[in-house]
Amino acid sequence: MKLLYTEISYSMTEILVKEARAYADKGYRVFYIAPNSLSFEKERSVLALLPEQGSFAITVTRFEQMARYFTLAKAANRQALDDNGLAMIFYRVLMQLQEDELKVFHRLRTDQAFIAQLVELYKELQAANLTAFDLTTLDRPEKQEDLITIMTKAEQLIAQGDYDQSSRLAQLAEAIKSKSLDDELRQTVLVIDGFTRFSAEEEQLLALLNEACEEIVIGAYISQKAYRLAFTKGNLYEASLAFIQQLAQQFQTKPIYTTSEKVFDVSFSRLTQLLEANHDYSKLDWQLSAKDKSKVVIWQALNQKEELEYVAKAIREKLYQGYRYKDMLVLLGDVASYQLQIGPIFEKFEIPYYIGKQEPMSAHPLVQFVESLERGRRYNWRREDIVNLLKSGLFGRFQEGELDQLEQYLVFADIQGFTKFSRPFTLNSSRQYPLPLLNQLRLAVVTPLQQLFKSQKQLGASLLDKLMTFFKTIQLADNFEALAGSRREADREKDEEVWKAFTGILETFYQVFGQEKMTLADCLALIKMGMQTAHYRTVPATLDVVSIKSYDLVEPHSKPFVFAIGLSRSHFPKQTKNTSLISDQERASINEQTASYQRLDVPSFENIKKNHQTALSLFNAATQELVLSLPTSLTNSSDDVSPYLKELIALGVPVIEKGKNRLSHSAADIGNYKALLSRLVAINRQGIADDMTSEDRNFWTVALRYLKRRLADEQLSLPAFEHHLTTKPVAPEVIETRFPSHQPLSLSSSALTVFYNNQYKYFLKYVLGLQEPESIHPDARIHGQYLHRIFELVTKDRTDAAFDQKLGAAIAAVNQQSAFQQVYQADAEGRYSLEVLKGIAYSTAPVLNLNQGMQVAKQEEAFELALGHQALIRGVIDRIDQLADGRLGIVDYKSSARVFDIGAFYNGLSPQLVTYLAALKNKGQGLFGAMYLHMQEPRLSLSDFKVLDDQLVAAAYKELTYKGIFLAQAKEYLANGSYHLNNTLYETDELETLLAYNEQLYLSAVKQIKTGHFLINPYTADGKSVQGDQLKAITRFEADLDLGYARRLVVLPVKERRQAFLTRMNEEIKHED
């Protein structure tokens, strides 16, 4: 074994390539081994250093892939399971285990995260040359027992599928021990680059290869100064030192210092030397020069978006200087938080990029299809699962409009379960659903699903055949191809990888579970688990892209220009978290009991060494310029400066406060078409910034004027998102069609209430005619109709029967009416609602019997009230009562508590009672009032009563009173009845004021409606919160941001509140006159 080390300013890759080429020239087969995370980039750099740009004698690969070269012929018919297959294996094992067979993990049997942890533990035990039986020092013996049970059954299933149970490295080790590869290995040389540690499995293999191969060459970056130190704890090179020294001791060889012909920029090595001195407690008598400081710089931006835009502009600027995209590397401190923002910003600046990261498939439509299919079977045709299955776009050939209609009907008719799906749709409503079309769609959905779901327990291979027939029937492959064809090229590549993973999962299922009997539910659950845990990785279509990856995967001298962003304290250094099933303490305890070449990694123990090594690689990642950046605000929370960056700042590395992106006329701002257009749009929205220089302001003013002129020629306009709640008037011809000018505008009190609640809601409901989803299940409207009908029959009954008998007969008659039978007898929920309503009827109806001096004159009385030629008000009055003197009163039944509030009326939110009074007064009828009757079952707190006597009954009846507007002149007729008269009596002139103001409310609304301009203005009572309907899903109204759009109600002090509102009404009436 030959161990080589060199200074960070030299190229270890060049040194090792030179070694590899020398052995290749002698006729040896050379394997150039790199870590998994660096193998792709390492292959490029190695081939670039070879004079021929390639060699058949030198293979750049990974340990596992090298093992395949030697063992492929020995295991020709056996394959290793990938992570998806292992996830399916463990899920099947956990499905078969009973709850009492697992003492610790029994509650996690179906947990996806737990299954992922089992997969990782299985692979980790292989790499550590351990089994579950070796985990003898876990905190709880029951934990080891559970793991032994799970792992043993998993290995049995793997053997059943004739898959390899051992890793490729273990197979190669066994082959070497058997001497079957001696001849090949004598002509083999290994060159190992980029490692600072080996796993136990790799160590064992390396020891065997050292005896069998011609030579093993291993290189690492270590400074001569660090190599000579006796104490290396905390040294910047500690990881590499420990790595090389351990190998030197084990294989009895002395590391050799060497250099390369290529020497990188001395500025980076000078910075490294200063950092090294900080960590080995030595001193240097020099500092960074001006040239050194020009090579390394620290940016501090406001947030992630600003940070990425500065990086994008810097990349564009390098392009103008003649560099290529492939010369740039972007490193991320936290990939998850930056990944979503990179795409839009880099696309705006037209920068092609590649993120070298595995992505989960869970959000892909194919995974959603599989999940919905499995849930549809498991939950017996649950509606949302069937709808999600259809909406995936992979089931059959349906038009989007057809699916919308089907979904609406399924919600309306409450279609749940196979029984309802299998029967023809017959229910309909006033909306007249197209039942023939819907039944055609129902058959197209139900027929293939029913054929699949009726499959009985059988061999997995048979179930898979039925599943493939189902896929063919619904045209899954064709639909997937159509879906991929409609997407961007980058997404099409992802689709291809997802399809490969899907077919691979089906093949694995056939191989492992093909001869095992199981139910269809188990079959679908296994495939779903494989899909949920699957990941995919795409490769760039071209090499000329900006590479993006996590900063801890970088190696020295990667690219000429490196931008490392997001280097806040939270992410630089990285804090390793152990999320496995075995804690760090348990790992350390296990390692103490194991033999040589058996070892579990203990992440926290290696954390400091690993972070120092990462920082060393990062600070030397660039060959020309290095930018280290951090946002002051990271995902909406401020973060401190990284300790490594603090070191650099102390050494004199300059810090640039980037601040907010300023618009200028520099090449970085105007040299790219999309970015320039984006900036012009931003200026149009925000205006020319005051802090621009006069030259910049002139440039952008002229550019914006030019753009607007060009857009006007093309009949286009710039969006104005800062006024995102500003609405446009409806075209006059549309208003004329909807509300003809020669006809009065038809309104109702409820429509007027909607208008003053939020004008835009009126537009949606009464102009566009949008309707809320309906249901066959009874709602508040149906409940109200039911009680109305009962009260109508009771009041019409003029027989001498007792009141309770009349009420019972009315309830029985209403229950027999088909309209109510259909909704209240359909299911248990409806029957329960019916019992509740009967209780309310028995509680409220006695009020009808208390006012003996009152007669019911009319019920369900329709009316029309004309306001000149401008408006026609229509409505229906629930009940009209008549006093002995002939005066009429209006009763409106309510299912919730309501009172007449003069403030709400003034603000247009409660016009109903006054509108009804106006309708009767218009007919020349005398009036005594208008009132609400709350249909309820009074609820009283018994703790409020000392004695359960007649006071309890009186209190119950007090809740059942008429509340509203009453004429003071009628008080003597009402005093002994069930009327709430406190502060509800109005004089005749006051009532006239209410009626006149009510007319003004209608006419003002009509005037605004006729303009066709409807504001998004939900009302606010206190100016702090919004009480009106915000319609967030449609308008994007946010109360905390858009409070200025809300309509502020007029709110007056409680003292003399009624008189104050009446005064304001009179003033406004006079003003209008």
UniProtKB/Swiss-Prot annotation:
GO process annotations (BP): double-strand break repair via homologous recombination
Please report which protein family the annotation says this sequence is part of. Belongs to the helicase family. AddB/RexB type 2 subfamily.
The entry's keywords: ATP-binding, DNA damage, DNA repair, DNA-binding, Exonuclease, Helicase, Hydrolase, Nuclease, Nucleotide-binding
Q: Which cofactor does it need?
A: Mg(2+)
Per the record, the domain of life is Bacteria
Q: Which InterPro entries match?
A: ADDB_N, DNA_helicase_suRexB, P-loop_NTPase, PDDEXK-like_dom_sf, PDDEXK_AddAB-type, Restrct_endonuc-II-like
| Provenance organism | Streptococcus equi subsp. zooepidemicus (strain H70)
- The answer to whether UniProt assigns keyword Chloroplast to this entry is no
Supply the gene name. rexB
Task: Tell me the Pfam families matching this sequence.
Answer: ADDB_N, PDDEXK_1
| E.C. number(s) listed in UniProt | 3.1.-.-
Classification via HAMAP family: AddB_type2 (MF_01453)
Further facts: Despite having helicase-like domains, this subunit does not have helicase activity.
Q: PANTHER family this protein is in?
A: RECBCD ENZYME SUBUNIT RECC (PTHR30591:SF1)
Which taxonomic lineage is given here?
Answer: Bacteria, Bacillati, Bacillota, Bacilli, Lactobacillales
What is the protein named?
Answer: ATP-dependent helicase/deoxyribonuclease subunit B
**Binding partners and assembly:** Heterodimer of AddA and RexB.
Which GO terms fall under molecular function for this chain's record? 5'-3' exonuclease activity; ATP binding; double-stranded DNA binding; helicase activity; hydrolase activity, acting on acid anhydrides
According to its UniProt record, this protein's enzyme class is hydrolase
Protein role: The heterodimer acts as both an ATP-dependent DNA helicase and an ATP-dependent, dual-direction single-stranded exonuclease. Recognizes the chi site generating a DNA molecule suitable for the initiation of homologous recombination. This subunit has 5' -> 3' nuclease activity but not helicase activity.
